[in-house]
């Protein structure tokens, strides 16, 4: 058994009928050459059956502790049914990009069956040009962006010939504990929880306005800042108590509306990594600076088209991995930064420089939070209280003002070509979730010389994800136009599902 962490549990607790914390990837496979096998549901199922022991997290299901006396556990599913988890369907003619995006939007809108392991794998046939899409859908409760990519290594090979994998060391399927056993475990852990809560309060309370998931709970900002001020007055806490809050004002936008549906829309685009690197090198900024600044330009142009651009800059939530090399695989080891997005800046070069400064300041604030505070926060609240507080925060987030306007996440993907069952992966698109209080989410995967972007919005959102994708392309061209070599982007291999150029 493996227990969920506080943040893992948060990902479960904040779910409701309209908000599901699910993510996915969409791998576009090249058409099979003559004589080469086509990737079908059966081919993929057989591949998973041979390799699933390499990803034990996929063999576990949830078991809750009665009365929420402790955080839930992952236990081996002795009845794991790959015929249930691996699925397939065919797109109708003509099988273009928009049909694929609609199908993926429908897939990520459907909730998981929580009595089974929280993942699904789909083979989508019928794409134009003979391509196939493989959709890997996962729940955020057991993976973050980095650990989700680790699970993909079960599917990925470095060559079309594949590889030999070691046999499982032990059989999967340990018996799940009974309800009474879980109750006894929860009761036995209460003294430990009390000790952790006391120690956690001393370490974490001054920094909760910078720590997930507490920073989104109403009132936390006031408590943390007051604690730091008091510590400074009495000379306690050292340099950490000099940490300032973001003091970012989140402007009202046309995106500010409560979630009314669980259904999502999704779109995707691909730009060349080398083009983003050219901008990075010319201006002496980071690749993430370029991605976020490009997104700022995209959101600005889209809001201008609607006549809804606020005078103040928008605020974006940027996840930051805190995973170390010796950390266990799986789970959520992530914190977040709040960053001012210079959507109020008309000039592209100035917008990039403002983004660089905003991200630099956010990183400095993030580094100022000691590791002891992060560890202390994990045990600050008793599980039953934490779960209720998380749910309350979700209900209030759409009513008392947003934490940020949008979410932008940048995740490094495979640096070289990978293959699934012998078929080369041409593009590797991400699918994020939409949370209460946020307009939309954008995730960027870097893969094999490209930046693959996915844009997710609620079905009834005024945001059109395809317009956002087009706006991102235009925004990157604006940055390229600032370079001495001119605006022409590098030649990008056609990897869109419908085989269209552009």
What are these regions (language model features)?
Residues 1-9, 24-39, 43-438, 442-473, ...:
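Soluble acyl-CoA-dependent acyltransferase catalytic core bearing the H(X)4D motif
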Residues 6-18:
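Acidic, low-complexity proline/glycine-rich segments
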Residues 20-22:
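Short, surface-exposed loop/turn motifs at beta-strand boundaries within globular domains
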